[in-house]
């Protein structure tokens, strides 16, 4: 099962019972798995790990494989007897995984995004009937457009603001809409 896990800057997990050191490609093993009690913990939803390791500048966030005995709860938390970190993710990659998760599970996401957003230095995510988001160079703009009479996702657009193909500024479904656009204006269009 593909899951997500956060760590401190040394890839040590300090939540739970003691410290545990992980490594990319190295399988960690536990005797038992019970969510919020014992085992190796992770989340199904990418941004779920930010509740535990939320510093995008220093914490490490990975996509992992959970295997062995697996126990899940209704909040998307996973405990397993085997956990292998597969790859470190940039904050931008983590946000893209979150957008894909929301597209597949529009009603199960614990995260709430407004119809208008500005970047946090890494990404901006907007969700709604007419989403708009702004990004500076080096960030990712993610737009999740909902159907008119539903919260299911109709369209997902991702813009890597590189300053060449995609310039800094505001984006809506369909692309670039301007360099300067106030939040109030974007919410009312």
Task: Name what the model sees in each region.
Residues 1-189:
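Short, glycine-biased loop/turn motifs at secondary-structure junctions and
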């Amino acid at each position: 099962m593909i899951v997500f896990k956060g760590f401190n800057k040394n890839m040590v997990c300090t939540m739970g019972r003691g410290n545990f050191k992980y490594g990319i490609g190295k399988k960690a093993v536990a005797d038992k798995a019970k969510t919020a009690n014992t085992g190796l913990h992770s989340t199904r939803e990418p941004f779920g790990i930010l509740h535990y390791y939320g510093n995008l500048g220093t914490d490490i966030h990975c996509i992992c494989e959970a295997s062995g005995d697996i126990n899940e709860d209704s909040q998307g938390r996973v405990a397993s007897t085997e956990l292998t970190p597969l790859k470190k993710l940039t904050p931008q990659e983590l946000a893209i995984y979150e957008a894909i998760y929301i597209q597949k599970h529009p009603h199960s996401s614990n995260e709430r995004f407004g119809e208008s957003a500005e970047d946090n230095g890494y990404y901006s995510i907007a969700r709604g009937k007419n989403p708009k988001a702004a990004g500076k160079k080096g960030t990712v703009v993610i737009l999740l457009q909902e159907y008119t009479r539903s919260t299911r996702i109709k369209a997902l657009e991702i813009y890597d603001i590189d300053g060449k193909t995609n310039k800094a500024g505001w984006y809506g479904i369909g692309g670039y809409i301007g360099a300067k656009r106030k939040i109030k204006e974007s919410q009312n269009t």
